């Protein structure tokens, strides 16, 4: 399945919210990301996509300094308003070492909201580049990655998730969400299988 998708459709790698502030705000997320070794794995995937001339897209959250467009309608939004985390231009909002955007990469950022298709140019950007398959990596397997996967399927993309390139705050919850939720809408695979399928 993955070989057919990556061999017959144009794919893009989407690196979601791999930012310093996420791991500062949520230490358990940082610990899981480190334990699972997702940063070097994502870096390898990104290098493979770039080598094939395929798009690498970063989807960070970078809040406006006055936080005016962050509505207190969820626990995460309330936490952002309380901590003033991930403000554009601050260290919190910057990318983790090794996953900074390269000159030919794309960045589709948002200042509020839960997932990267909402309130951004991501869908239009993908359409204009002729992308049909999206490969999702980054954080978190609890919220951001499922949100991207559901929206991606609704927008008629094929969705691939290398499970060893995503992380959440708890491994047990991660496993349940991958098995009971993500696999229903996405092809679950590994970094090595994606690289092999790229050829």
PLM regions and their residue ranges:
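Short glycine-enriched, charge-decorated loop/helix-capping segments at active-site entrances
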Residues: 27-34
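Active-site-adjacent betaalpha module
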Residues: 1-12, 44-52, 69, 76-199
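Short, conserved beta-strand edge motifs with alternating hydrophobic and charged residues
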Residues: 15, 57-60, 108-110
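Short acidic, Gly/Ser-rich segments with clustered Asp/Glu that frequently serve as metal-coordination loops
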Residues: 19-25
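Short amphipathic alpha-helical segment that frequently serves as the phosphate-/nucleotide-binding helix
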Residues: 35-43
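N-terminal nucleotide-binding beta1-loop-alpha1 segment
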Residues: 12-18
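Catalytic metal-binding/acid-base residues of hydrolase active sites
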Residues: 19, 62-63, 140, 166
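Short beta-strand segments at enzyme active-site cores
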Residues: 54-61, 66, 162
């Amino acid at each position: 399945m993955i070989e057919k998708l990556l061999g017959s459709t144009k794919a893009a790698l989407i690196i979601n919210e791999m930012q310093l502030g996420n791991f500062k705000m949520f230490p358990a997320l940082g610990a899981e990301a480190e334990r699972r070794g997702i940063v070097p794995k994502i870096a390898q995937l990104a290098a493979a996509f770039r080598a094939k001339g395929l798009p690498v897209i970063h989807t960070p959250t970078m809040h406006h300094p006055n936080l005016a467009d962050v509505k207190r309608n969820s626990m995460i939004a309330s936490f952002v308003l309380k901590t003033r985390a991930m403000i554009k231009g601050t260290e919190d909002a910057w990318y983790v070492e090794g996953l900074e955007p390269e000159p030919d990469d794309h960045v589709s950022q948002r200042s509020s909201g839960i997932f990267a298709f909402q309130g951004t140019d991501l869908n239009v950007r993908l359409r204009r580049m002729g992308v049909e398959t999206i490969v999702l990596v980054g954080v978190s397997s609890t919220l951001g990655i499922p949100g991207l996967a559901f929206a991606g399927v609704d927008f008629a993309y094929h969705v691939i998730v290398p499970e060893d390139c995503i992380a959440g705050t708890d491994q047990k919850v991660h496993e349940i969400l991958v098995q009971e939720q993500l696999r229903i809408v996405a092809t679950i695979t590994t970094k090595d299988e994606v690289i092999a399928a790229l050829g």
